[in-house]
Amino acid sequence: MLDESLEPGWLSEEVKTGTTIIAIEFDGGVVLGSDSRVSAGETVVNRVMNKLSLLHDKIYCALSGSAADAQTIAEMVNYQLDVHSIEVGEDPQVRSAATLVKNISYKYKEDLSAHLIVAGWDKRGGGQVYVTLNGLLSRQPFAVGGSGSSYVYGFVDAEYRKAMSKEDCQQFVVNTLSLAMSRDGSSGGVAYLVTIDEKGAEEKCILGNELPTFYDQ
């Protein structure tokens, strides 16, 4: 057995997504995005984790905080939504998914360390983005989270406009992620995007060398 004094520090550190996550509404749907870096302490343990987790066919969540805790919440909600849709015979509402995330997060707030942004499309409300944190449930036109969010608040406030097109929202998400990944040591890797509308969900991965650069990079 390895002497504890010789063990690398990351073996005893909690694995966290660090992360930058974002979601934004457009007329007819939503776009979610995230970086892909996962760290334990100062060590990067996964460079390409997809932090956009499927909750139902047209509902996703973006994960931040403890990787294990965030994935556990997402899997619990995914299971409950599947059961619900079978029982009622129709797809669940985005708000219902967000409420489940909120309830689980609040019930186990002393044990879990995770923040999820829930976004998707349903026939009643169209594209929707919800913030869930410590029992809070709030619908927003866009939301950012994770350690990288503090580096991009000024950028998103300046660049966001009402009634942006799907293509504009996709570029907005890519630019925000690229800026955060260039400044936040806990964000990096590739950028994952998912665009959701009435037709379904379209996933995309953008490699690091394909991301836009800024003047100081």
UniProtKB/Swiss-Prot annotation:
Prosequence residues removed at maturation: 1-18
Primary localisation category: cytoplasm
Record-level GO BP terms: immune system process; proteolysis involved in protein catabolic process
Enzyme class: hydrolase
Site (Cleavage): 18-19
Gene3D superfamilies: Glutamine Phosphoribosylpyrophosphate, subunit 1, domain 1
One GO term describing the cellular component: nucleus
Keywords, ordered alphabetically: Cytoplasm, Hydrolase, Immunity, Nucleus, Protease, Proteasome, Threonine protease, Zymogen
Subcellular location: Cytoplasm; Nucleus
Subunit comment: The 26S proteasome consists of a 20S proteasome core and two 19S regulatory subunits. The 20S proteasome core is composed of 28 subunits that are arranged in four stacked rings, resulting in a barrel-shaped structure. The two end rings are each formed by seven alpha subunits, and the two central rings are each formed by seven beta subunits. The catalytic chamber with the active sites is on the inside of the barrel. Component of the immunoproteasome, where it displaces the equivalent housekeeping subunit PSMB6.
Family: Belongs to the peptidase T1B family.
Protein name, UniProt field: Proteasome subunit beta type-9
Organism field: Oncorhynchus mykiss (Rainbow trout)
